[in-house]
Amino acid sequence: MTTTPKEREPKVKVSVDVDPVPTSFEKWAKPGHFDRSLSRGPKTTTWIWNLHALAHDFDSHTSDLEDVSRKIFSAHFGHLAVVFVWLSGMYYHGAQFSNYSAWLADPINIKPSAQVVWPIFGQEILNGDVGGGFEGIRITSGLFHLWRAAGITNEFQLLCTAIGGLVMAGLCLFAGWFHYHKRAPKLEWFQNVESMLNHHLAGLLGLGSLAWAGHQIHVAIPINKMLDAGVPADQVPLPHEFILKPALMKEMFPSVDWGIFSGVVPFFTLDWGKYAEFLTFKGGLDPQNGALWLTDQAHHHLAIAVLFIVAGHMYRTNWGIGHSIKEILEAHKGPFTGEGHKGLYEVLTTSWHAQLAINLAMVGSLSIIVAQHMYAMNPYPYMGIDYATQISLFTHHMWIGGFFVVGGAAHGAIYMVRDYDPAVNRNNVLDRVLRHRDAIISHLNWVCLFLGFHAFGFYVHNDTMQALGRPQDMFSDTGIQLQPIFAQWIQSLHTSAIASTAPYVGASVSPIFGGDVVAVGGKVSMMPMVLGTADFMVHHIHAMTIHITVLILLKGVLFARSSRLIPDKGKLGFRFPCDGPGRGGTCQVSGWDHVFLGLFWMYNCISIVIFHFSWKMQSDIWGTVNADGTIEHITGGNFAASAININGWLRDFLWAQSVQVINSYGSALSAYGLLFLGAHFVWAFSLMFLFSGRGYWQELIESIVWAHNKLKVAPAIQPRALSIIQGRAVGVAHYLLGGIVTTWAFFLARFGALG
C-alpha cells in the first residue's frame, strides 16, 4: 500500500543569532570604545562631554538597525536591573531601618519613617520624633500605605521582598548580556508587532492584572479586613495560610466554596453573584481608611485582566486569523486625510525614535493623569490623611509627566532628522501635517497670545483694582464673578448621575465632585472641592503654559528638517548652535534647541500646577474636623480671596508658606532649609551658563593656561570652553535641578512642620 507523502513540515523559524558579539572586558575597559574618534583618547576637555553625549546614542555607533535594536533591547534589561536594585533598597530600608510595624498598629498618629541618620560628631538633629518613640526622617513616598494595601504585615516580609528584588536584578543583568552576546534576536523579531502586542497585552497586562487580582483576593483583602477590624498585625495569619487553609477564607467570605477547583466554578458558570462579597461595586472611598475599597480594586483588576487577555488574542500571528496592524493602518482613511495612516507602519517598525516619541508622549500624559487621580481617589489606606505624602506624589507624577512629554518631542524631532523618509510618507497624515505646519503653528501662536494676554490681564486688573481700593471692581466670587461653569457642571454630573449612568454603583468615584466629607481620625481625607473665580483664573494660566510648551515643542518637530530660514536644516543634524558664521539669525533653531526652550516652559507649567494644587488643597480640602462637625482648613479657606491677584500669590502662598523652611534651622527639618538655600544657589548658578558667551570663557581659559605654562604645570589635555550646546545643556540641567529641589524643600518643610 502506498501513501501520499505528507508535505514536509516547514522548518521552525529561527529568530535569533547565536554568539553574534564576543564578550570582551578588555574592549569595554577602553573609554569611548564605541566611537572611532573617541577611542583614540582625549586631546581636549571636549572629549569627556562627547563621551557622555554619545555613549547611549546608538545611532552614532552603527547604522545597522538590527544592531541598534539589540543594543536598545539589552539596555532595557539593564534599566530594569537598576529599577529592581533601587526598589530592593526601598524595601530593605523598610525592613531594616523603619517603624513600619508601629505605623501599621497606629497609622493615624504615627508618621512613616524608614531612615535614621547616623550621628556624625554627635549630630542628632535630623532625626525627628515621628510618634511612638521612634526618631528618624519622615518619608513621603507612600510605600507604607502601599505595603499595607498589599497585605505586608511585618519587616521580615519586606526583607524577603528586598532579596527577591536583588535576584530579579541579577536575572535582568544576565538577560541583558545573554540577549546581546549569546542569543541576539534578529531584526524581524523586533518588527513582529502582532506577536509583541499579543505578548504585552495578554501576557504582561492581562496575566499581570489577573495575578494582582488573585493576590488582592487571596492575600490583601483578608489581611486588610483583619487589620481594619483591629486584629494586631502579629496575630494576622501569614499570606500563604490564606491560600493553603480554605477555612480561613470561608470564615470571612462564606458564600464561596474556597477549594482550588470549586472556587472558580461560579466564574465559568456565570454564577458571579457568589463573589459579591469580595468583588464589589461600591464606588467612592472606604470611610474607615479613606482609600478606594480594596474589594472594588480586585473587581477592577479582574475585569481589566479579562479585557486584556481578550485584546491579546486579536492580532494575526501564526494562525492566519485576527487583525494585521499594517492593514488596519492602511485602511484608516478619512474624508480629509488623503492616504490616511498609510506608511505609518513602516515608520514605526523602522524608526525606534518615532515609536519612542509616541510612547513618551502617552506615558507622560498618563503620569499627569495619575497625579490627578491619586489625590482625588486615594488608592491606599490612610494615605489621604498623610498630606506630605499626597503633595509629594502629586508633585512627583506631574514632574515625571512633564519630562516625558518633552522627551516625546525630542525623539519626534530626532525621528524627523535621522529617520524620516519622504518616499514612505506620501500624502499621509504625517505628510499633510508637515505641509500645513505654518497654519498649525501660526494658529497655535495666536492661541498662546490670546490666553497669555487675557489670563495675565485678569491678574493685572485685580492687582490694579486692589491697589486703588476698589474691591467691588475686581474679578472675584464677591465682585465680578468668573465662575467655571463647565467644571461645576461636570462635578454635579459625576455626583448626581450615578444612579442612571452606573446603576449598580453605590457612590460617585470620589467625594471631590460632591457628596460627603470623608474624615479619618479627625483629619479630612477627601471632601467636595468648590471651584470659583480664583480657579477659573489660574486654569487659564495653566492653559497658556501648556499651549506655549506645545507650541515650542511642536514647532521643533515640524520644522526639524527644514524651514524657510534654513531649507536644508535636516543636513545640519538634530543639534547645532547656528548655521555657520556666514548666516546671521540662525541660532537656536535646531531640534535640540526647541527641546531646550521647551524644558523651561514645561518647568513654568508644572510649577504653577503644583503651586495651585498645594494652596487649593490646604485652603479648601485638607484640615481637621472639630467635634461639632465644622472643618478647620490649614490656611482657613483663603485661596478664593487671595489667589485672584499676583500680590496674593506672593504674600499668602510663597511668603506665608515658606515660613517653615526659612525657620527650619535648629529643628529636625533643618536639612530642608539647607537644601532650600543650596538649590537656590544651583538655580542661580545655571544663569551663568545660560547668559554667557563661549568666547568669553575661551579667552579666560587661555589666560589661565598661559599662567600654567609659566609655572610649567600645563595640562597634557588642552582645556576648552564648553560649546554653545554644552553650555545650554549644563544651564538647563542646573536650572531645573535647582528649581525642583527648591520646590521639594519648600513643600516638605511646610508639610513636615504641619505634622
Curated annotation (Swiss-Prot):
The region annotated as signal peptide is none
- Report the subcellular localization: Cellular thylakoid membrane
Q: What class of enzyme is it?
A: oxidoreductase
Query: Record keywords: Phosphoprotein included?
Result: no
- What does the note accompanying the cofactor annotation read? PSI electron transfer chain: 5 chlorophyll a, 1 chlorophyll a', 2 phylloquinones and 3 4Fe-4S clusters. PSI core antenna: 90 chlorophyll a, 22 carotenoids, 3 phospholipids and 1 galactolipid. P700 is a chlorophyll a/chlorophyll a' dimer, A0 is one or more chlorophyll a, A1 is one or both phylloquinones and FX is a shared 4Fe-4S iron-sulfur center.
Tell me what organism the protein belongs to.
Synechococcus sp. (strain JA-2-3B'a(2-13))
Specify whether Iron is a keyword of the entry: yes
**UniProt keywords, alphabetically:** 4Fe-4S, Chlorophyll, Chromophore, Electron transport, Iron, Iron-sulfur, Magnesium, Membrane, Metal-binding, Oxidoreductase, Photosynthesis, Photosystem I, Thylakoid, Transmembrane, Transmembrane helix, Transport
Q: Where does chlorophyll a' bind?
A: 680
By which gene is this protein encoded?
Answer: psaA
Q: Summarize where [4Fe-4S] cluster binds, as residue positions.
A: 578, 587
| InterPro entries per UniProt | PSI_PsaA (IPR006243), PSI_PsaA/B (IPR001280), PSI_PsaA/B_CS (IPR020586), PSI_PsaA/B_sf (IPR036408)
Q: From which domain of life does this come?
A: Bacteria
Indicate which residues the UniProt annotation says bind chlorophyll a: 688, 696
Annotated disulfide bonds:
none
Q: How does it sit in the membrane?
A: Multi-pass membrane protein
Name the Gene Ontology biological process terms: photosynthesis
Q: How is this protein organized at the quaternary level?
A: The PsaA/B heterodimer binds the P700 chlorophyll special pair and subsequent electron acceptors. PSI consists of a core antenna complex that captures photons, and an electron transfer chain that converts photonic excitation into a charge separation. The cyanobacterial PSI reaction center is composed of one copy each of PsaA,B,C,D,E,F,I,J,K,L,M and X, and forms trimeric complexes.
**What's its catalytic activity?**
reduced [plastocyanin] + hnu + oxidized [2Fe-2S]-[ferredoxin] = oxidized [plastocyanin] + reduced [2Fe-2S]-[ferredoxin]
Q: What is this protein identified as?
A: Photosystem I P700 chlorophyll a apoprotein A1
* Transmembrane feature ranges: 72-95, 158-181, 197-221, 297-315, 352-375, 391-417, 439-461, 536-554, 594-615, 669-691, 729-749
Q: Which GO terms describe its molecular function?
A: 4 iron, 4 sulfur cluster binding; chlorophyll binding; electron transfer activity; magnesium ion binding; oxidoreductase activity
Which residues does the annotation say bind phylloquinone?
697
* Pfam families given in the database record: PsaA_PsaB (PF00223)
Where is it found, in Gene Ontology cellular component terms? photosystem I; plasma membrane-derived thylakoid membrane
What family name appears in the similarity comment? Belongs to the PsaA/PsaB family.
| Role, per record | PsaA and PsaB bind P700, the primary electron donor of photosystem I (PSI), as well as the electron acceptors A0, A1 and FX. PSI is a plastocyanin/cytochrome c6-ferredoxin oxidoreductase, converting photonic excitation into a charge separation, which transfers an electron from the donor P700 chlorophyll pair to the spectroscopically characterized acceptors A0, A1, FX, FA and FB in turn. Oxidized P700 is reduced on the lumenal side of the thylakoid membrane by plastocyanin or cytochrome c6.
